Amino acid sequence: RAREILENADLILAEDTRRAAQLCRLCGIQGRRFLSFYDHNEAERQEEVLRLLREGRDLALISDAGTPLLADPGYRLVRACRKEGLPVSPVPGPSAPAAALSAAGIAPLPHTFLGFLPRDTAGREALLTAYAQVPGSLIFFERKDRLKESLATAARILGPRDLAVCRELTKTHEEFILNRLENSMDLSDELLGEITVIIGPPEVTERTPREEVESLLRAELARGGKARDVARRVQSAV
């Protein structure tokens, strides 16, 4: 389906037009028109793209790797399309969070995808603190040069948990490194490629049986409210 859409699109919006052109060549697709569309020009290009869609043109949006909008460009455009009633259709493709969850052996549900962690230490600390008591696994992307620093911050804030460092997913050098968050400093400094991190859910203390916590969690979820508030109520109860 993806190939058919790329073959028939009037214009392909691409995070990197060179990589998009290479993809089309590998798929035997010729004569396509491309428009550069990425985080730093999305706002200025949006009206031009919307005009083409209003005229009935068929446009395709692709990212360098993974799925558009999931830590990739496209959110503002898709939101604008929905507000105007312009049709948007997803095309199944590679997604690092889904691939990592399917093979890491860490509880997949519930989970929260955080995208890329903030670059600054204070920002990372604030984000991880906000999600520290949210039930379920946490998933995020991180650069190789910030990985160990981010994991050290996570270990300090989140406490003992399961950890999976997944790199180069679905590629030739795919690797899953399973460890404990508190032991993350044991990781090699030589990890290369695109890295997806999964941190397992908060661990239940011996003082509170898992069944009791799960029962309390179900009751609090039934009460409603934001996930953060539910987590705080459960934490205070146990």
Predicted regions, residues:
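Glycine-rich, flexible N-terminal cofactor/catalytic loop recognition
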Residues: R1-D39
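Short active-site oxyanion
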Residues: L6-I12, G85-S89, S137-L138
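Alpha-helix capping/helix-boundary segments
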Residues: R18-A20, G66-T67, A96, R146, ...
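Conserved helicase motor
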Residues: L35-E44, L117-T121
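Acidic, metal-coordinating catalytic cores used for nucleic-acid/nucleotide bond scission
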Residues: N41, A65-P73, R119, L147
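Glycine/small-residue-rich loop that forms an oxyanion/phosphate-binding "nest" at active or ligand-binding sites
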Residues: Q46-S95, A99
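Class I SAM-dependent methyltransferase SAM-binding "motif I" and its flanking Rossmann-like core
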Residues: R76-V134
